[in-house]
Amino acid sequence: MSQGQSKKLDVTVEQLRSIYHQFHDILEEKTDLHLPKKEYDDDAVRREVQIQLQEFLLSAMTMASKSLEVVNADTVGKTVKQLIMESQEKYMEPFDLDLNEQVRKMYQEWEDETVKVAQLRQTGPAKINEVYNNSKDEYLAQLDGRIGVLQARMMQQQSADHDDSTDDADDHINWEHIKQDYVASLNELYQTQQDLPKVRYNVEKVKRLMDFLEED
């Protein structure tokens, strides 16, 4: 042991790195046991665990360094932590806190979206059916209203045709009503024809969405 520092244990850089590697290998074995490697390399969970273990091991070795004295001459100016970090690079890329935080957030967002999709698959079909039925009922009610207006106009016209007491002035007024009713009927028919493509499109869109949600 070095004079003046008898309480510290003399070790070489090689011994320090050997200790670190042995601990690292033990932790890796535990990781493989509980988190087996997957077929693809982009395993965010496993990488996060490895990062946490690296930080834990680095912290433990740093605390232990208070009882160690690295005796190699080429380590002048370097701390035990720096030597450990150099050894750490053998196992993984330099630790990037910002990149790791971005990966963690993206993984969390992916998990959140996965939960939302799962919930949508359960509740989506019923909700879509409800919206579709409400829209269908509303459109049919509008059609019934238009048909009712046209029927009322036709009944008024038939009643006017059978009224023998109608004079020439009334005949002129009735013809004006007939013309107005005819124009209104054409407008109603045109509007209905304009609405049909939109209705067909909405029905097809709902059908595609339901097919997607019902997929396994």
Swiss-Prot record:
<feature type="modified residue" description="N-acetylserine">
    <location>
        <position position="2"/>
    </location>
</feature>
<dbReference type="InterPro" id="IPR013950">
    <property type="entry name" value="Mis14/Nsl1"/>
</dbReference>
<dbReference type="GO" id="GO:0008608">
    <property type="term" value="P:attachment of spindle microtubules to kinetochore"/>
</dbReference>
<keyword id="KW-0498">Mitosis</keyword>
<dbReference type="GO" id="GO:0051301">
    <property type="term" value="P:cell division"/>
</dbReference>
<keyword id="KW-0131">Cell cycle</keyword>
<dbReference type="GO" id="GO:0000776">
    <property type="term" value="C:kinetochore"/>
</dbReference>
<keyword id="KW-0137">Centromere</keyword>
<dbReference type="GO" id="GO:0007059">
    <property type="term" value="P:chromosome segregation"/>
</dbReference>
<protein>
    <recommendedName>
        <fullName>Kinetochore-associated protein NSL1</fullName>
    </recommendedName>
</protein>
<comment type="function">
    <text>Acts as an essential component of the kinetochore MIND complex, which is required for the spindle checkpoint and kinetochore integrity. MIND plays a role in establishing a bipolar spindle-kinetochore interaction by joining kinetochore subunits contacting DNA to those contacting microtubules. NSL1 facilitates the attachment of two of the DASH complex components, DAD2 and SPC19, to the kinetochore in a microtubule-dependent manner.</text>
</comment>
<keyword id="KW-0007">Acetylation</keyword>
<keyword id="KW-0539">Nucleus</keyword>
<dbReference type="GO" id="GO:0000444">
    <property type="term" value="C:MIS12/MIND type complex"/>
</dbReference>
<keyword id="KW-0158">Chromosome</keyword>
<keyword id="KW-0132">Cell division</keyword>
<dbReference type="Pfam" id="PF08641">
    <property type="entry name" value="Mis14"/>
</dbReference>
<dbReference type="GO" id="GO:0005634">
    <property type="term" value="C:nucleus"/>
</dbReference>
<dbReference type="GO" id="GO:0000070">
    <property type="term" value="P:mitotic sister chromatid segregation"/>
</dbReference>
<dbReference type="GO" id="GO:0000940">
    <property type="term" value="C:outer kinetochore"/>
</dbReference>
<keyword id="KW-0995">Kinetochore</keyword>
<comment type="subunit">
    <text>Component of the MIND kinetochore complex, which is composed of at least MTW1, NNF1, NSL1 and DSN1. Interacts with DSN1.</text>
</comment>
<dbReference type="GO" id="GO:0000922">
    <property type="term" value="C:spindle pole"/>
</dbReference>
